[in-house]
Amino acid sequence: MKKAIFGAMTALITPFKNGKLDEAGYEKLIKRQIKNGIDAIVPVGTTGESATLTHDEHRICIEIAVETCKNTKVKVLAGAGSNATHEAVDLAEFAEAHGADGILSVAPYYNKPTQEGLYLHYKNIANSVKIPVLLYNVPGRTGCDILPETVIRLFNDCENIYGVKEASGSIDRCVDLLAHEPKLYVLSGEDAINYPILSNGGKGVISVTSNLLPDQTAALTHYALDNEFLKAKEINDRLYNINKIMFCESNPIPIKAAMFIAGLIDTLEYRLPLCNPSVDNLKKIEETMKSYDIKGF
């Protein structure tokens, strides 16, 4: 049986203060996730603004995540993707050497590899480490789609590739993957379809909303994994509006604004080209948040 990291996972935001990484603030956010029942955290992914972090900042985030989760049940699935295979390998090796439990590796963006190129890319990454590797398919951002046959080929050929974070927005894709390979771990990468994916055999979620509502995301996921689908759906229905507003602008713009409004980060800062949400959207985010019980530190 393959070693896997699954369940309720949070795609962590990266807080900044005066343009620099807010290390103390980052640690506080992680401790709050641990306290509220999350199974794993995902530092330096899309939501963590990995594209605009320096390599040093990327590594510091992983180190803080590993150190903060030490001696807890919470796993660290470190973001370690790149559109250059050698760089993705370097990041994967760093994550493993510094104690990450696994890595999340986004499909190479911009250079649009073929399916064979994707296979070779991921096979090189998997061969470079022993920890679990989760593929990350998000064609809307990368311009590159890891097709089901490539996912299954990698799952069968690489011992430590255990599944895929599916953020294509297609429930059919997830059903198709599981129909062809029931042992594959399919994780939802879009909060709006967490419940449909979980109720069709998905093994967890990598959530943006759980930055704000980790307890609710954990409860939804755990109910679904325990086959208590009515309870899971009740929570999913309650989360509908907040999940929707979190994508009123490009992620992670809305979730960072929400975290600031909730007092969970000290300053609302992004790295350009990301910038503050519009005044109208900021008001909508704030209004939507009033319907939810947001736990503090």
Curated annotation (Swiss-Prot):
**Upper classification of the organism:** Bacteria, Pseudomonadati, Campylobacterota, Epsilonproteobacteria, Campylobacterales
Know the name of this protein? Answer: 4-hydroxy-tetrahydrodipicolinate synthase
Which terms does the UniProt entry file under GO BP?
A: diaminopimelate biosynthetic process; lysine biosynthetic process via diaminopimelate
User: Which domain of life does the UniProt lineage start with?
Assistant: Bacteria
Catalyses:
L-aspartate 4-semialdehyde + pyruvate = (2S,4S)-4-hydroxy-2,3,4,5-tetrahydrodipicolinate + H2O + H(+)
Does Amino-acid biosynthesis appear among the keywords?
yes
Stated family: Belongs to the DapA family.
Entry's Gene3D superfamilies? Answer: Aldolase class I
* Record organism: Campylobacter fetus subsp. fetus (strain 82-40)
Question: Where along the sequence does the record put site: Part of a proton relay during catalysis?
Answer: T46, Y110
Instruction: Recite the UniProt keywords alphabetically.
Output: Amino-acid biosynthesis, Cytoplasm, Diaminopimelate biosynthesis, Lyase, Lysine biosynthesis, Schiff base
Provide the binding site for pyruvate: T47, I206
